[in-house]
């Protein structure tokens, strides 16, 4: 998985296209990420003995990593947001580092 927790990303496909957020959780086996306040779905909770009335809660649903890109620069009044896919490369020290493909810069 090329993304890490707390990376700032932009959604590039789906109903929340163009939305910017931070990664809260990574689901490695499913190849999905959960982004704060993005892809909200309504969950119906059944009534139980502790909770006599059922209720509706909003929860973030996972998004596939192919629909998310790393945010390089936020949008401003004069320019659009710059985003790119991530890659991995081995640097001179022999360590694997994450690389922004568009700008060819390493990130931590």
From Swiss-Prot:
GO terms for cellular component: ribonucleoprotein complex; ribosome. One of its GO terms (molecular function) is rRNA binding. InterPro entries: KOW (IPR005824), Rib_uL2_dom2 (IPR014722), Ribosomal_uL24 (IPR003256), Ribosomal_uL24_CS (IPR005825), Ribosomal_uL24_KOW (IPR041988), Translation_prot_SH3-like_sf (IPR008991). Keywords: Ribonucleoprotein, Ribosomal protein, RNA-binding, rRNA-binding. GO terms for biological process: translation. CDD domains: KOW_RPL26. It holds the Pfam family KOW. SUPFAM superfamilies: Translation proteins SH3-like domain. The keyword Transferase does not apply. Belongs to the universal ribosomal protein uL24 family. NCBIfam families: rplX_bact. Part of the 50S ribosomal subunit. One of two assembly initiator proteins, it binds directly to the 5'-end of the 23S rRNA, where it nucleates assembly of the 50S subunit. One of the proteins that surrounds the polypeptide exit tunnel on the outside of the subunit. This is Large ribosomal subunit protein uL24. The gene is rplX.
């Amino acid at each position: 998985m090329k993304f890490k927790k707390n990376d700032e990303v932009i959604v590039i496909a789906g109903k929340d296209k163009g939305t910017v957020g931070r990664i809260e959780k990574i689901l490695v086996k499913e190849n999905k990420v959960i982004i704060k306040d993005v892809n909200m779905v309504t969950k119906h909770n059944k009534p139980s003995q502790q909770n006599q009335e059922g209720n509706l809660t909003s929860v973030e649903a996972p998004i596939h990593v192919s629909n998310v890109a790393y945010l390089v620069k936020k949008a401003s009044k004069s320019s659009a947001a710059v985003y790119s896919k991530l890659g991995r490369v081995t640097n001179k020290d022999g360590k694997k580092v994450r690389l922004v493909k568009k700008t060819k810069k390493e990130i931590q």
